[in-house]
From Swiss-Prot:
The gene is HAT1. The lineage of its organism: Eukaryota, Fungi, Dikarya, Basidiomycota, Agaricomycotina. Keywords: Acyltransferase, Chromatin regulator, Cytoplasm, DNA damage, DNA repair, Nucleus, Transferase. Catalytic component of the histone acetylase B (HAT-B) complex. Acetylates 'Lys-12' of histone H4 which is required for telomeric silencing. Has intrinsic substrate specificity that modifies lysine in recognition sequence GXGKXG. Involved in DNA double-strand break repair. Residues 52-54, 235-237 are annotated as: Interaction with histone H4 N-terminus. This is Histone acetyltransferase type B catalytic subunit.
Amino acid sequence: MAETLEEWISDSNQVLNLQMVRTPEDASLLQYEEQQNIDVFNPAFTYPIFGDNEKIFGYKGLDIKLHFASGSLRQYLDISYDAKLASSTTPPDEIEGALYKFIPPDYTKSEVEFQKRVAGDAETFKPLGEKIGSYAHPSAGRKGKGQGDSGMAAGKAIEDNEDVVEYEMYKATWSTPGFREYHRRMQIFVLLFIEGGSYVHEDEDAWEFIVLYERRTRPDSGIFTYHFVGYVSVYPFWCYPDRVRLRLSQFVILPPYQHQGHGSKLYNMLFRHMLDRSEVAELTIEDPAEAFEDLRDRNDLRFLVKEGIVKDPMLYVDVGKGKRGSRVEWELAIRRKYKIAQRQFDRLLEMLLFRQLDKGNPDKVKAYRLHVKARLYRFNYEMLSQMTVEERKEALAKTYESVVEDYKRILGMTFG
């Protein structure tokens, strides 16, 4: 019987099919390499919706379509299957009821109605909030690199250039008209693509969001259409005596847009926006996933190199001699200037030191090793203080080797 019931179990990550839908006219403007923007994709996680095992019981040939109008994010739900188990003792799981708890109730189950919404919203939807930045990428299939932030200065030239696609970022809060309702449509991506992700509380007024869109121009009409790419949410916490600490809580780039540099653009916009705000003391990250931590490291490293940190003689002063004197003052001044959290700042300096390290000089290598171990000891003091001297030495040695290997990996990704 167990073997028979197994046939009625579906992997919820595989049967939940997501799609960002455009009008046929807008879809036809995409080049071959851009078709992934409208292809079906699957979630990374569904346990918040369908349980820890991420299984759905009671169906064969199950197909759950959750489609979104690519800009407005209005939703269409369709549940189909080849067979449904008829059993009173082990009834099939209630699929729509499970999803209903996590999406706004105004979704439609009519494909015709959904296509009408897509068509109407394509012409009327405009991003909510204040535009705070933009950048341009070549259309897929075109050779060359994106124009990066220089695209912001190009103005009308970008709008008239069919070879590039512009991406725009908008800042919004709960007080932005219409954004609360819009957020209820986009927050499902947090559950589906961030492990341990959860919805934010709407009664917490201070939440801030930056939403990233792809902007297209219809060639004949000149109408701009906007297509959701991802977003980041941050929350300000009081920081003594009269400033705030911004905590990055959620960061999502949809799979069709991943590995194209959009995550870095969104992160760097947040970083610059934070630097421009005098009331912000630093940016912290809440339980970052490894992929996001790598993205953060790469961009923070590039930023510090661009700012000339490796050319500053103070970076190399008193390495391996402990935290003291002028080096402490220099580190504090630089960290406060760039508003980077302490542990992250320490790691960044260690990576830059390792990159510049003369690895053929035993004295320099030893000084660097002592420098890193001293930081590791401070960071893990409670655990290490309970060990014997030999155990502590062994633990620090293993941790140091692991840290250095990770630094090599990150530096390789960042600088080649």
